[in-house]
């Protein structure tokens, strides 16, 4: 039997500051990463050698491309991921305080993953 972990839910881009301890308004440089708890779980599971699959929706945009390419590189099955031209991929900007605690600012209404339907 081939067991598969299927995750369903949000897929977004996390923009993480290159410097810690700054207010979001003062940050000049970010790195982009795939984000969303389901995406993180699928990628981590695949990196451990298990089969994982994602059911979500991303925009037909550069950020959606980045998510799909990153998941593919992690060996995550993306055959159930939908693409839409109607809504963009969700974005999250993450502020990190001096201790590394996170504070999120989301840009997700409207966004692709919130409009996933059967």
Enumerate the predicted regions with their spans.
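Glycine-rich phosphate/adenosyl-contacting loop at the front of the ribokinase-like
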Residues: 1-76
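Conserved N-terminal subdomain of the carbohydrate kinase-like
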Residues: 51-118
């Amino acid at each position: 039997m081939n067991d598969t972990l299927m995750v369903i839910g949000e897929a977004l881009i996390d923009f993480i500051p290159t410097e810690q301890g700054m207010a979001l308004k003062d940050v000049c440089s970010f790195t982009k990463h795939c984000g969303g708890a389901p995406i993180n779980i699928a990628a981590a599971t695949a990196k451990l050698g298990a089969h994982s699959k994602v059911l979500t929706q991303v925009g037909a945009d550069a950020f959606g491309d980045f998510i799909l390419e990153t998941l593919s590189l992690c060996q995550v099955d993306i055959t159930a991921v939908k693409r839409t031209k109607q809504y963009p991929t969700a974005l999250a900007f993450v502020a990190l305080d001096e201790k590394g605690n996170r504070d999120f600012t989301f840009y997700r209404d409207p966004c692709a993953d919130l409009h996933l339907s059967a």
